[in-house]
UniProtKB/Swiss-Prot annotation:
CDD domains given in the database record: HATPase_MutL-MLH-PMS-like, MutL_Trans
Stated role: This protein is involved in the repair of mismatches in DNA. It is required for dam-dependent methyl-directed DNA mismatch repair. May act as a 'molecular matchmaker', a protein that promotes the formation of a stable complex between two or more DNA-binding proteins in an ATP-dependent manner without itself being part of a final effector complex.
Organism: Rhodopseudomonas palustris (strain HaA2)
Single GO MF annotation: ATP-dependent DNA damage sensor activity
NCBIfam families: mutl, PRK00095.2-4
Identification of the protein by name: DNA mismatch repair protein MutL
Keywords attached to this entry: DNA damage, DNA repair
Family, similarity comment: Belongs to the DNA mismatch repair MutL/HexB family.
Amino acid sequence: MPVRQLPETIVNRIAAGEVVERPASVVKELVENAIDAGASRIDIFSDGGGRRKIVIADDGSGMTRADLALAVDRHATSKLDDEDLLQIRTLGFRGEALPSIGAVARLTITTRHAGEPHAWTLGVEGGDKSPIAPAALSQGTRVEVADLFFATPARLKFLKTDRTEAEAIRDVVRRLAMARPDIAFTLAGEERAPVTWAAALPGAPGQLIRLGDILGADFRANAIEVRSEREGVAVEGFAASPALTRANALGQYLFVNGRPVRDKLILGAVRAAYSDYLPRDRHPVVALFVTLESREVDANVHPAKTEVRFRNAGLVRALIVHALKEGLAREGRRTAANSAGSVISTFRPASMPAANWDWRASPSYPVGGSAIDAPSFAERPQAAFDVGGPSADIRTHEVAPDLLDRPLGAARTQIHETYIVSQTRDGLIVVDQHAAHERIVYERLKASLAANGVQRQILLIPDIVEMDEATVERLVARADELAQFGLVVESFGPGAVAVRETPSLLGKTDAASLLRDLAEHMAEWDEALPLERRLMHVAATMACHGSVRAGRVLKPEEMNALLREMEATPNSGQCNHGRPTYVELTLTDIEKLFGRR
C-alpha cells in the first residue's frame, strides 16, 4: 500500500485519542480553558456519565469572532507568545483540546468578548465545522459537548459505567476547585443535587475553607498548615494529622504551579515524611501546592499534562519532606485534642438503673464471704448522704503543685493497668501507656542510630529461636541491618537462629517473638525499599516489643516519669502506628459532658 497523507478529520481523531481518553478528560480540558480565560465562576453539567452531554459555562473573557474561528483548528492557541515551551504559565497551551473534542463529538461553542456587540456560536460535528453565527450570551463562554465518541464508536466500548464516569468527572472538578479557591464552581447533573463551592478569600484561610468543603469537616479539623521555601521553590498546603488516614493514596492531592498532577516523586516524599507516624497499610490525606519557575518544571511530558518532570527533583523532594515533618512535629499535640472532641461528640449520658433494681442480682455482686459481708460493714449501716457534712476522706498520693503546670500534668491513678490518668490545671489527660512508651523507645532508637549506634547487651546464654529455613535465610541476609540496632543474630543450623546480643534499650525482651515479627515485615519489603526506610521499620518493630505493655501495674513515680519522658520526646502525640498516645479533656469539655455548658 503506498504512503499517503491522511485527511484532516482522521488526523484529528487520532490526536483525540491522546487528549480525550474519557468524558472526564473533556471536562478537564474545558474547565482549564475557563480558568485560563480569567473566569470567576465556572458551571459544569454532565449527563450519562458525560457521554450524552457535557456543558461548561464560565464568565471569563470570552473570544472574538476571529478567535472563535481559529479555536477549533489544531495547534491554534492564545496561550503561547513565542516558541519557548519552558515558560508556560497557563493550564492549557497545546491548542489541541477543542479540535480533538470536535473530531469525536458534537461540539457547540457560544462565546462573547467584551469588545463584541453580541455573542457568536460555532458548531463542529465529527470534525466538520458549521458557519459562525450570531447568538445570545451575556458574558464569557459556553461549551456544549454532545454524543461523545459518536464518530469513533470503538472508543465507547472501553468506557466504564455511567456512574464510574460521573465519579471521574467529579474527581477532576474537585481537584481543579482545590487548586483555585478564588473561583466559584458548580457541579450539576447525573440526577444529583447540584454542588456549589463558593469563591473563598485568598491565602491559607480561604484555601482551608475550600479544602474543607471538598474533603470534609474531618480534614478541616485535623489539617496542619505546612510551608517551606528554598532556592525559588515553595511548598505549601495542608496535611491531615496522623489521626486521619485512609486505606489508599487517593486522599493525596498534588498541584504544581496550580496544575493537578499525579507525580511519583511527590507521592514518595509524602510517604517518607509520614513514615514515622503511620503503619504500612495506612495513607495520609494531604493537599500540597508546589510553586516554582516555569523553566524548572516540564509540564509537556504527557498530552493530558497530568505528569511533570522537575529539573531539580532532589530539591523538591527534600522541601516536601521537610515541610511535612516540620508541620507534624509542630502540631504533635493536635491528635489528643481532636480525639477528645470526638469523644465528646459521641458521648451519651449513662442510664440509671430502675429504682426497684436488685443489685444482688448483678454479676458484680460478690459471691461467698467477701469483704462486704464482714462484721465491720454489717455492724455499721450506711448513713444517708449529708449535703452539709464533710466530704469523704479519699486519700491519694501527694502531688507536687508544680507538676500540675507541666503539659501532661501529674499522674493521679492507673485504670485497667493500661491507662494513666493525670491532672492538669485546666483538666485531665488519659494516656495509653503502651502507645506512649512505644513512641519514646522508637525515638530513642532513632537517636542512638544517628549518633554512635545502639548500645548492646550480650546474652550470657544465646537465645536459640527455631524457624523455617526461608525465614532463617531472610533474617541472616539482613543481619547487618539488625546489628545497627544492637540485635546480633546468626544462623544456628538449617532451621534456627541464635540471638547473641540485644539492644540495651529493650531490656529483657522476648527474642523469639521479636524475630518472628521482624521476619514477617521483611517478607513484605520491596527490594527497592531504601535502606533508611528498612531501618525505620526495624526500629518501629523493636519499639513495639520494647515498650511497657498493657496490664502492667505502674507506681506513681513510674507514671510521672513516663509523662516527663513524653514531654521531652518528639512526636509523642502519636505512636508509631498513628494512634493517639493520649486524650486531653479540659474542664470545659468535662462540664459539657455533665450538661453544665
